[in-house]
Regions:
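Histidine/acidic residue-rich metal-binding segments in metalloenzymes
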Residues: 1-130, 139-157, 174-186
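Short His-Asn-centered micro-motif
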Residues: 25, 133-137, 163-165
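His/Asp/Glu-enriched short active-site or ligand-binding loop at hydrolase and phosphoryl-transfer sites
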Residues: 159-171
Length: 186
C-alpha cells in the first residue's frame, strides 16, 4: 500500500508537469497473477536482501504493471511497452564502463501468450489504457501486428498501436519489414 502511495505521488507529479504518457520496457513480458498477501511477502523478501525466484519476480512485475496501466487508463494517459532488449551482455565492458554503454542486443523470448494475458486482464476491467507496443525482435512483428486487433474498441481510434521500428530495426529494411507485417495482419 505504501509503495502504491509513493508511486501515485510520482505519477501525480509527472502529470502536474504535463506528462500524459508512460514508457515501460521488458526483456521478456511477464504474466503471473498474485494477491496482495503474496505481493507483500515477495516485497518483504526482496527488502530483506533475499533472492527472488523467477516466479516471484514475474508476480511482482505483473501486478506492478497492472497497477500502472490501470492508473494510466483512469487518467487518460498513453502507455508504451518496449519488448525484447537484453541488456549489458558484456561483463568485462559492464565492469569497465557501467550499464547501458552499448553492449545490449535483441532478446529472443516468447511474447504472444503473456502479452495477450496482460492486456486482456486489463481489458476485462475496462482499464486498458491507450497502448503502443514496440518489439526489438523482428520475429515478433506479426505477433504484435495481429495482437493489435484483439483489443481495439470505441473508446479511442487505434487504441492499441504498433510502435515504429526502433533501435536495431530503425533502418530501411527494419521499417519495411515492420510495415509489411502490420499491413498483412491489419
Amino acid at each position: 500500500e505504501k509503495l502504491e502511495e509513493v508511486l501515485l505521488s510520482r505519477i501525480d507529479l509527472f502529470e502536474k508537469m504535463g506528462c500524459r504518457a508512460s514508457d515501460h520496457a521488458f526483456t521478456r513480458v511477464p504474466y503471473k497473477r498474485a494477491d496482495a498477501a503474496e505481493l507483500d511477502r515477495v516485497f518483504k523478501k526482496a527488502l530483506g536482501g533475499e533472492e527472488l525466484s523467477e516466479c516471484e519476480v514475474d508476480e511482482y512485475k505483473t501486478e506492478l504493471m497492472r497497477f500502472f496501466a490501470k492508473e494510466y487508463a483512469r487518467r487518460g494517459w498513453g502507455m508504451e511497452i518496449h519488448i525484447g532488449a537484453t541488456r549489458n551482455n558484456n561483463s568485462r565492458m559492464f565492469k569497465s564502463l557501467g550499464p547501458d554503454s552499448g553492449f545490449d542486443s535483441i532478446a529472443d523470448h516468447e511474447v504472444a501468450d503473456n502479452l495477450s494475458r496482460l492486456l486482456d486482464s486489463l481489458d476485462v476491467e475496462d482499464l486498458l489504457p491507450k497502448t503502443i507496443l514496440f518489439t526489438l525482435n523482428p520475429k515478433d512483428n506479426y505477433v504484435l501486428g495481429a495482437m493489435l486487433g484483439n483489443f481495439q474498441n470505441s473508446q479511442a481510434a487505434s487504441k492499441i498501436q504498433f510502435g515504429s521500428a526502433w533501435w536495431f530495426n530503425d533502418n530501411i529494411d527494419g521499417m519495411r519489414e515492420q510495415m509489411k507485417a502490420l499491413a498483412n495482419t491489419g
